Amino acid sequence: MPITKDEIIKALEEMKLNELNELVKAIEDHFGVVASVGVAAAAPAEATNAAPTEVSVVMTSVGQQKVAVIKVVKELTGVGLMDAKKMVDGAMPVTIKEHVKPEEAEEMKAKLVEAGASIDLK
């Protein structure tokens, strides 16, 4: 019996960020394609006034407590320690998590700010 879309989505939801990155690279190599973000059409004027339903948590600077920030990034993203360190040590700004509900994003921001990072929600 073939795998259903729902089973694939469920499996993807359980994967860690680094595993998803490896999967995307494997798909690109196997099918000879490049994963790129498409440009969306302009939203109607009335929709732009509504509060966003999803936001991205973006770190703009690490601050003095780099180790504390790495621990929080690891906790929030579910990635391994080395991947969290790479995110924190990399070029800023860096997106910590995308497509997050605004309430969850505020909680993430509070934890990261408490650890010493500067965060923007976009």
From Swiss-Prot:
Keyword presence, Ribosomal protein: yes
Gene3D superfamilies named in the record: 3.30.1390.10, Single helix bin (1.20.5.710)
Pfam families: Ribosomal_L12 (PF00542), Ribosomal_L12_N (PF16320)
Entry keyword set: Ribonucleoprotein, Ribosomal protein
A single GO molecular function term of this UniProt record: mRNA binding
Gene Ontology annotations for the cellular component aspect, listed alphabetically: cytosolic large ribosomal subunit
BP-aspect Gene Ontology terms: translation
Role played: Forms part of the ribosomal stalk which helps the ribosome interact with GTP-bound translation factors. Is thus essential for accurate translation.
Subunit structure: Homodimer. Part of the ribosomal stalk of the 50S ribosomal subunit. Forms a multimeric L10(L12)X complex, where L10 forms an elongated spine to which 2 to 4 L12 dimers bind in a sequential fashion. Binds GTP-bound translation factors.
Family the UniProt entry places it in: Belongs to the bacterial ribosomal protein bL12 family.
Protein name as it appears in the record: Large ribosomal subunit protein bL12
Organism annotation: Mycoplasma capricolum subsp. capricolum (strain California kid / ATCC 27343 / NCTC 10154)
Gene symbol of the encoding locus: rplL
